Amino acid sequence: MLTDMPNILVTGGCGFIGSHLVEKLLDQGFFVTVVDDNRSGSHYIEHEMVEYHKCDVMHFNPHHASIEPPSAIFHLANSPRIRRALEFPTETITNNIATTCAVADWARIFNCKLFFATSSSTQYV
């Protein structure tokens, strides 16, 4: 880690909301670790205090990743596409639940006490 400031982990940090969150965390001086497959987001923030892991949340292994344990986790990685959710509602809901459970497990692995989970409009399909 490049700073003495706490590390904040953000899933979906390349999406619209996630990238704005990353910018705000950087403005406050935090080091930010982003896990995002970058399929639906294109808001990649080039900054010396951001470390990117380009992968699906379900394929990220916190045991093998060389990241500083985060002091907080913001989980924003969910299926954002309404059209796809309407076509494949079970797959969408299953994916959103599975990714949230996986990231909650990261909080346990990292002994992280602050875990914030959000969702997308696809939860209402």
How would you describe each model-predicted region?
Residues 75, 101-125:
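Conserved Rossmann-fold NAD(P)-dependent oxidoreductase catalytic core, especially the SDR/UDP-sugar
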Residues 19, 43, 83-84, 101:
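Alpha-helical elements of the RecA-like P-loop NTPase motor core of helicases
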Residues 41-42, 80-81, 124-125:
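Short beta->alpha connector loops of Rossmann-like oxidoreductase domains
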Residues 2-72:
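N-terminal Rossmann/SDR dinucleotide-binding element
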Residues 23, 98-101:
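Surface-exposed alpha-helical interface segments used for non-catalytic interactions
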Residues 48-49, 88-89, 119:
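Acidic, glycine-centered active-site loop in nucleotide-sugar glycosyltransferases
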Residues 12, 85, 119-121:
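Catalytic nucleophile serine of serine hydrolases
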Residues 57-95:
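NAD(P)H-binding glycine-rich loop region in Rossmannoid oxidoreductase-like domains
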